[in-house]
Amino acid sequence: MKIIKNVLTKETLDKTRLHLQKNIGAYKWSSSEILWNPGLRIGTTGSTLVQETPQWLRDILIPELNKVLPEYEDININYHLWQRGSGISAHSDNDYIFGATLYLNEEWHVNFGGLFVWQPKDEDTMRAIIPEENMLVINDNSETHMVTPVSMEATQYRVTLQIWGKHDPADVRTCLLY
């Protein structure tokens, strides 16, 4: 797992958040209840809302992300709004060159849950991080990872960009974790 801080410029981070704020109430969102394999929802009670990023935003994000991402042939970038009770069960993203998470919340308290937990290759222990603004976590080694459920007392959504690099642009899967 690679952890990189301050990935986006302030201008790009602001544009990404502004687009989200303008579209948060739109009828353009889908749900992890519909999109994700049921095995990924074990131990969670809430739903994660998912929306693709528009091309104009991808055109801004990709040049900055490419400075730190592994090489790929195609990429998907989606907003995820992790609601209370939402999380994702242990999985490895092994169908992709990499899976990555970019955290968009300005602040996130450890008691809100939504911790990113992973097991490094060849280790018996698990590690965890608290979401931090503009931090990117890249899984390019198919390491098992999960997100703990967001607390029912969380005062905000856990907001991320989920990014998947693929080998074949013709692969039209939804790029939601399998």
State each model region's role.
Residues 1-69:
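Non-heme Fe(II)/2-oxoglutarate
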Residues 59-62, 66-178:
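Catalytic core of non-heme Fe(II) oxygenases with the double-stranded beta-helix
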